[in-house]
Regions:
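A positional/architectural concept
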Residues: 29-54, 58-59
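Amphipathic, coiled-coil-like alpha-helical scaffolding segments used for oligomerization/assembly
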Residues: 145-149
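Surface-exposed short loop/turn segments
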Residues: 48-49, 53-54, 59, 66-107, ...
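Positively charged n-region of N-terminal signal peptides that target proteins for export
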Residues: 1-4
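Bacterial Sec signal peptide processing site at the extreme N-terminus
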Residues: 11-34
């Protein structure tokens, strides 16, 4: 019963305070006409596909972007034997935005620290999951930036 009351109260508060989702269709005021990649990596392809999802074909703000991304995995901590115990994965996305009125370059990055795992297969699966999460964060940042242009 308490949960129902809290949910109803929260919905009234959020509706009355002017809350709007970040990615509502009216906020996407850009159309990506062309996405070119400096290198043809899987990382660039994933980012390009995610960016296309947020493109609004009805927008008057038509842009072309050139993307270049880099993924780094660094050892941040070692155990007593000298084996890595903690890593940091960082993804950096450089975007060159081209419009008839301007040419801007912006960089977005996101990183995550994680522990080593003795099961290398499980570690690789976890790294893929981390990579996808970091890509989503970077795409969110870039969509917000592109919406503000």
């Amino acid at each position: 019963m308490r949960k129902i009351i809290i949910i109803v109260l929260a919905s009234f508060i959020l509706n009355n305070c002017g809350y709007t989702p970040i990615y509502s269709s009216k906020e996407k005021n850009f159309y990506i006409e062309k996405i070119s990649q400096k290198n043809t990596s899987k990382l660039n392809s994933k980012i390009a596909n995610n960016l296309k999802i947020f493109s609004n074909e009805n927008s008057q703000n038509i842009i072309e972007i050139e993307i270049n991304s880099v993924k780094k995995i660094e050892i941040t901590q070692k155990d007593d034997k000298g084996d890595p115990s903690r890593f940091q994965m960082t993804i950096v996305l450089n975007v060159n935005i081209i419009n008839e009125n301007y040419n801007k370059t912006q960089s977005f990055s996101s990183s995550f620290n994680y522990s080593n795992n003795s099961d290398k297969f499980a570690l690789k699966q976890y790294e893929k999951e981390i990579e996808n999460n970091l890509i989503n964060k970077i795409v969110e940042k870039s969509v917000v930036y592109l919406s503000d242009l």
